Amino acid sequence: MRTLVLIRHGESVWNRENRFTGWTDVGLTDKGAAEALRAGRTLKNEGFAFDEAFTSVLKRAIKTLWIVLEEMDQMWIPEHRHWRLNERHYGALQGLNKAETAERHGMEQVHVWRRSYDIPPPPLAAGDPRNPARDPRYAELDPADIPLTESLKDTVARFLPYWHETIAPRILAGRRLLIAAHGNSLRALVKYLDGIGDDAIAGLNIPTGIPLVYELEDDLHPIRSYYLGDPDEVARATQSVADQVKR
């Protein structure tokens, strides 16, 4: 049996402000840092240990990983950062308040943008200062790989090559891995691992800062998955993600 642990970053400043974040590089709140600390403590107390860790190039995920590993006394393990683990790009919605956007465009339209599989939000204009092509961390990427918006389908297509080429071979080699990433990049991976249908994926919400453990067969098919946390607390945190457009 192989074990993989996923964790969505702790609450970010824009999570607290209920804004669409995407590739915008915002930090953790004090609550988010505390969530990461608690996750690290829980993992350590439950006997988990890791050989390598993976994260995005966005600081809310990087800092979550650091806090978790520090609490586990494992900051020395190899850490791999890659843009393919970034959050889904929310296009022209980035920075907008979710509830206010729902008031302007309607709950149904915002739900489609947030949770449909293959419909992206309106794109950024190429000259928009939020265009990731202006960010030095993406300077060496093929311009065709830099999104101006993404659907979840696009995020799956971005994430899976890195999974197949880099992450999965390490799991098959017996490495114990931790992935600290984002709500939608993790939804993309969970969709793939669990074989969730394109329509059903709309109902999947991943809470911040709670470890999600996968026990995998030798061929990496899931045996089971579960959150490390109080079930009632996990349910409340998950529902809170679903209710963001109502706040």
UniProtKB/Swiss-Prot annotation:
Q: Which reaction does it catalyse?
A: (2R)-2-phosphoglycerate = (2R)-3-phosphoglycerate
Source organism (scientific name): Geobacter sulfurreducens (strain ATCC 51573 / DSM 12127 / PCA)
Residues annotated as the enzyme's active site: H9, E87
Task: State the HAMAP family in the record.
Answer: PGAM_GpmA (MF_01039)
Summarizing the function annotation, the protein's role is: Catalyzes the interconversion of 2-phosphoglycerate and 3-phosphoglycerate.
Q: Which domain of life is it from?
A: Bacteria
PANTHER family from the UniProt entry: PHOSPHOGLYCERATE MUTASE
Query: Which pathway is recorded for this entry?
Result: Carbohydrate degradation; glycolysis; pyruvate from D-glyceraldehyde 3-phosphate: step 3/5
What biological process terms from GO does the record include?
gluconeogenesis; glycolytic process
Binding positions (substrate): 8-15, 21-22, 60, 87-90, 98, 114-115, 183-184
Q: Known Pfam families for this protein?
A: His_Phos_1
Spell out the subunit comment: Homodimer.
EC number(s) on file: 5.4.2.11
Name of the protein in question: 2,3-bisphosphoglycerate-dependent phosphoglycerate mutase
Signal sequence residues: none
What are the protein's UniProt keywords? Gluconeogenesis, Glycolysis, Isomerase
Asked whether the UniProt record includes Disulfide bond among its keywords, one would answer no
